[in-house]
C-alpha cells in the first residue's frame, strides 16, 4: 500500500476525430512491484469483481489478455474495476514493452470489443472465487464476518490503488489466509504488506486474529 504513484499519459494519435476517440488516452502508474505497471483507460474495465490471468492458458478467456500475453514479454495480466495491471517477464524492457501495451489497450477500448470470449465473464476458464480456499470453522462465523468486512472496506481499496487485489481464503485457529493478485502477486514488498499492514490492522480490530499468511 504505497503513496500515490506518478502518472503519465499516452495520447491516441492518428485515430478518427470522433470526440470520444480523440479524447481517449491511457494513463500509467508505477506500482510497488517493479515488474508491474498499472494502466488506466479512463473507463470501466470490469463491471464488478476482478480477474487475474497468470498464464497464457488462462488468458485464452479474454482476447485482450491473450493479446497482451502474445507479446511474448508478459507473465501476468490483471483486470480491476477501472484499470489493467500488466506484469513484464524477467529481462523485459518496459521502455519497449509499454508502447505495445498501450497500443493494445487503445485498440481494445476504442473498438469497444468484448473483454471476454463470449462477451462476458460467465463461464470463463479462470480459477473460480472459492478455489484454493482454506475454509472456516462454522463456530467462527461472526469473527469471519468482521475480517471480511475489514478486508472489503479497508484493505482492498488500498491494494487496488497499487494495481492489485487481495482475496480472503480462510480463517483457522487464529490465522487469516489471504491471496495476493495483480501487481501484489510476486511483489518484493508483498510480505511486508501482509505482515506489517494487513496483519496489524486485523489484529487491532479483531483480537482473535493472531497471524496473517499468504495462501
Segments and roles (model prediction):
Residues 3, 10-215:
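Domain-level signature for proteins that mediate thiol-based redox and metal-cofactor handling
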Amino acid at each position: 500500500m504505497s503513496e500515490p504513484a506518478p502518472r503519465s499519459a499516452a495520447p491516441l494519435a492518428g485515430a478518427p476525430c470522433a470526440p470520444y476517440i480523440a479524447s481517449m488516452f491511457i494513463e500509467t502508474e508505477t506500482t510497488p512491484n517493479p515488474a508491474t505497471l498499472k494502466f488506466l483507460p479512463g473507463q470501466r474495465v470490469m463491471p464488478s469483481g476482478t480477474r487475474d490471468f497468470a498464464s497464457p492458458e488462462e488468458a485464452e478467456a479474454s482476447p485482450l489478455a491473450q493479446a497482451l500475453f502474445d507479446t511474448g514479454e508478459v507473465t501476468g495480466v490483471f483486470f480491476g474495476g477501472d484499470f489493467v495491471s500488466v506484469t513484464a517477464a524477467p529481462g523485459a524492457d518496459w521502455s519497449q514493452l509499454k508502447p505495445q501495451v498501450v497500443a493494445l489497450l487503445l485498440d481494445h477500448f476504442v473498438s469497444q470489443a468484448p473483454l471476454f470470449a463470449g462477451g462476458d465473464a460467465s463461464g470463463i476458464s479462470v480459477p473460480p472465487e472459492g478455489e484454493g480456499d482454506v475454509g472456516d470453522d462454522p463456530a467462527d462465523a461472526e469473527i469471519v464476518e468482521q475480517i471480511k468486512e475489514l478486508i472489503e472496506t479497508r484493505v482492498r481499496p488500498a491494494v487496488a490503488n497499487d494495481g492489485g487485489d487481495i482475496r480472503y481464503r480462510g480463517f483457522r485457529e487464529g490465522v487469516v489466509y489471504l491471496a495476493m493478485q495483480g501487481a501484489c502477486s510476486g511483489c518484493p514488498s508483498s510480505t511486508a504488506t501482509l505482515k506489517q499492514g494487513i496483519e496489524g490492522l486485523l489484529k487491532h480490530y479483531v483480537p482473535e486474529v493472531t497471524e496473517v499468511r499468504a495462501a
